[in-house]
Curated annotation (Swiss-Prot):
Protein name as catalogued: Kappa-scoloptoxin(11)-Ss1a
Endpoints of the signal sequence: 1-16
Source organism of the structure: Scolopendra dehaani
Propeptide span(s): 17-25
Gene Ontology CC terms, in alphabetical order: extracellular region
Amino acid sequence: MFYSHLLFFTFTFACSSSLNRKTKREMDLEDIILDTCHQKAVCAHIQMHLKETYVDELCKCGGGQECPLHWDPNDGHSITLAYNQWKFCSPTSQDLPVCTREQTAREFSYDMKPVSKKVQMFMFFNCLCPENHFYEFFNEREEETGGGQLAIIEERCEKMKQCEKTQICQKIETLQGKFLFKHVKCFCPGDQNCNDDLKKADAIDVGDDGSVQHYMKCH
């Protein structure tokens, strides 16, 4: 299936997504087409760790508009949940309904061109997951288009679990000392907090590309 070709890691967790796919930075940049955004599509995803941010641009705004690529929950172009912010070309409503358990909360579309092997990616919100929930993959469907193969990934809201005693609560990835990605796995019990200090990571792992995974536990 098309989805399996993009399988890599959990996109964003705890108020963002558990979609297993590659982001722009993990694919060869030459494989990605930043096409003009569809109406109501997310143009960028921003993650924040302490005061650092990482921006993943998904498409280009048309009609003379620009995608706001900086963290600002009050710009009228954003949906903000915890350390994640999604940007839109046009002013967006902050009053999206809260998702029900059975509702399709978010959709991703991937359009792979058979000749060029280029991929177009678009993200759409239908509703927002409640607090302490995340977006969980539940369905994939494929459609043949005149110019390639279209895969639609659908997600629902799932409640995040409380961390067990020795469980990793989050993973933070850096490259050359700069923040790239945060993946929250569970929430800490009681008065404990998930460590954010990279110098106090409970474990680290260095990837072949020089990226460093910092694994944190509750303290």
